[in-house]
Amino acid sequence: MILRQNKSVHYEAPFLFLLFGNERALLLDTGASADPAHFPLRETVDRLVAEWLERHPRPGYDLLVAHTHGHGDHIAADGQFADRPRTAVVGPGLDEVTAAFGLGEWPDGLGELDLGGRVLDLIPGPGHHPAAVVFHDRHTGLLLTGDSFYPGRLYIEDRAAYSATVDRLLDFCATRPVRHVLGCHIEMTTTPGVDYPRGTTYQPDEPPLQLTPGHLRALRAALDETADRQGSHPYGEFVLVYRD
């Protein structure tokens, strides 16, 4: 399931992902607001899990809460799950991420997460955030890239690490079935190269969230073209923003 925080609650309006396996579900990211009165994520997830279990009854079903990366607009509602039974929350720090997912050779190597009959590949993705992880769902072919790649402003904090991440993703896509590339925001308009200003709370002219491995190749070319530059550089479906 794909969820999105309402822009009337927080302008970042991040996307969140809830994936169901036979033994447990994965909630990927918890959004930009902590207060359940304004952003009742726990209540929403509990309802969705209960509805899924009505259709697929089984005892002892667990929930794992993890993150594409540790920026505040992706971890704010972690606390809503602190007292939830049969629930584990993976902290957003690098040590926590590598230990939880067996990524001891970071940033090299891949990890695996088995939800029970549904396996995800985990790809180290630093560059935007030092502990960013990209998740590939083998069941659907979705590549979940967090803030590393999406139709919007790609904030690059470490260009060498980010460039290596893009290469890892391209290598992965060359040998695995990837149907769609899904990030966690939409900040572009449908006019190529034109984004909504930061803080916008109404975006009626958004493009679709989904991108493709072809867009990753375009990103690789854009990084090469701007390798010795600073600042912002708009391209068709994204804007590079160098911060290092």
Residue map of PLM features:
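A short alpha/beta connector and helix-capping loop motif
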Residues: 40-42, 46-48, 155-169
